[in-house]
UniProtKB/Swiss-Prot annotation:
Descriptive protein name: Co-chaperonin GroES
Gene3D superfamilies: GroES chaperonin (2.30.33.40)
Gene name tied to this protein: groES
Record's subunit section: Heptamer of 7 subunits arranged in a ring. Interacts with the chaperonin GroEL.
Organism annotation: Staphylococcus epidermidis
GO-annotated molecular function: ATP binding; metal ion binding; protein folding chaperone; protein-folding chaperone binding; unfolded protein binding
Cited Pfam families: Cpn10
Length: 94
């Protein structure tokens, strides 16, 4: 398992739908990259210059929206994860 450091989180991206609303099946090149995912691991938080640690605002299991091209993809076996900085998270979906 991956353990994020600092203010990073690890997410599992939600897959984009295979068909458009009109029913047409989309090819891989026609699909937009999904910018939603579920957090599976959270780092300790951000360390300020004065040594204070700020706790993350998100938790494991949160469904989030993140910036479109943010993060680094990492493959572990057959699964692909995305490592993001907490600042790249735009919202929590409730």
């Amino acid at each position: 398992m991956l353990k994020p450091l600092g203010n990073r989180v690890i997410i599992e991206k939600k897959e984009q739908e295979q068909a458009a609303k009109s029913g047409i099946v989309l090819t891989d090149s026609a699909k937009e990259k999904s910018n939603e995912g579920v957090i599976i691991a959270v780092g300790q938080g951000r360390l300020l210059d004065n040594g204070t640690q700020v706790a993350p605002q998100v938790s494991e299991g949160d469904t989030i929206v993140f910036q479109q091209y943010a993060g680094t993809e990492v493959k572990r076996g057959a699964q692909t994860y995305l490592i993001l900085n907490e600042e790249d998270i735009l919202a929590i979906i409730e």
